[in-house]
Amino acid sequence: MPRLLDSVAVARERWSEAPGAIEVVVVDNASTDLTAAVAEERGCRVVEVQERRIASVRNGGAAVAGGEILCFVDADSQIHPETFIAIERSLATGRVVAGSTGVWMERWSLGIALTWALFMPLVWLTRMDTGVVFCRREDFEAIGGYDERRFFGEDVQLLWDLRRIGRKGNQRLTRLRTVKALGSTRKFDLHGDWHYFSDLFGLLPKMLWSPRASSEFADKYWYGKQRTPER
């Protein structure tokens, strides 16, 4: 997280308005490290969310944020120095309801590159990407925020819902490709560069039909947690 906060500090300084107008909220999701202490030392607002579900974490941060524009990013990412400038310009056109920056991975291999290539056609087709995801607060609240019933895929559902309400005002999703975030390869480091092909795709049908399987996968993949088997 320190690398993320360093990159946010640079991007705040680049913004044309007062840097202090950009509030940084860090959600402490039952961490066992120094997440909260580091964030507070850096002047961030810290909120605790015990529920280990990414949608709940993001909604918890949005609930205490005071800004009219909301931006969401993972703690192991780094944002581009021009991020806030690009977001402000994009939303100021009035033609954009929400968007994302996309990511450039911090390292590459054949497995990571093929995984990236597999998903890119869907990204191009839908304009839904990862990295820094942003929208107006009023639109976020209009759709009810992130869907907390979902164990994963909450970011896709959020952008899908925002695109739906944007159509009413002739607004669209956008991808800010010139300000890509630097994405962490932590999951590839942990599970292997080919794990999407060897593990995840095989589990997908089961997860789509079984809420318990989805919950168990989310606990293991994002939190490294094994549930106690039911007796």
Residue ranges of predicted features:
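Short, well-formed alpha-helical segments that are part of the catalytic scaffolds
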Residues: 1-16
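A conserved acidic beta->alpha catalytic loop
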Residues: 7, 28-36, 77
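Acidic donor-binding/catalytic loop of UDP-sugar-dependent glycosyltransferases
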Residues: 34, 73-90, 160
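Glycine-rich, basic loop-to-helix element that forms the pyrophosphate-binding segment
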Residues: 49-65
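Short aromatic/hydrophobic "clamp" motif used to bind/position activated sugar donors
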Residues: 70
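Conserved donor NDP-sugar-binding/catalytic core segment of glycosyltransferases
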Residues: 81-111
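A short, conserved alpha-helix in the catalytic core of glycosyltransferases
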Residues: 139-142, 149-170, 174-176
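Hydrophobic helical membrane-anchoring modules
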Residues: 164-231
